[in-house]
Amino acid sequence: MVRTEQNWENSFHFFWRFIHNPLKIGALRPSSAQLCRATVKAIEPEKCRCVVELGPGTGVITQYLLNSIDPQSRFLAVEIDPVFHENLQKRFPGTAIHRGDAEDLGKWLQPQKSGLADAVVSGLPWTLFTESQCRSILAEIASCMQPDGIFVTLCY
């Protein structure tokens, strides 16, 4: 992989956020290009009308997702970290990026109005959550997905 200024900047910001908030940020650096490609392939983007990303961090996977789904498809991201959220809004203007908790996904997706997600990609730090939090988040995800929807989660 060729290191670019953007890659270095993403890695630096990610590591800096981890140092400042290790109980919320679950990785030391952003996902690799290989992981991004595998994640996108797993959700079958050509079939998706609605894609959700939870915990997008610096937006590395977000970029791959947005480049792969149909421009008419709906995309929604939820990021809890205020610095990541602000940077994501600047990097992806006009994209639905909400600041908050994954347990509130339905509030932003509003599946009763705009349909359920065909795919949910999660970069959430599951090992930092209690069992109760994991169950609550997974229940919220399930309630917002199509019955045949695809759920992909990344663990580090």
Tell me the role of every PLM-derived stretch:
Residues 7, 11-46:
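Class I SAM-dependent methyltransferase Rossmann-like catalytic core
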Residues 48-57:
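Conserved class I S-adenosyl-L-methionine
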Residues 58-70:
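Conserved SAM-binding loop of SAM-dependent methyltransferases across substrates and taxa
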Residues 81:
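Conserved SAM/SAH-binding beta-strand->alpha-helix loop
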Residues 85-111:
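S-adenosyl-L-methionine
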Residues 135-147:
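A short glycine-rich, Lys/Arg-flanked "PGG" loop and its adjoining helix->strand segment in the class I
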Residues 148-155:
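Conserved beta-strand signature within the Rossmann-like core of class I S-adenosyl-L-methionine
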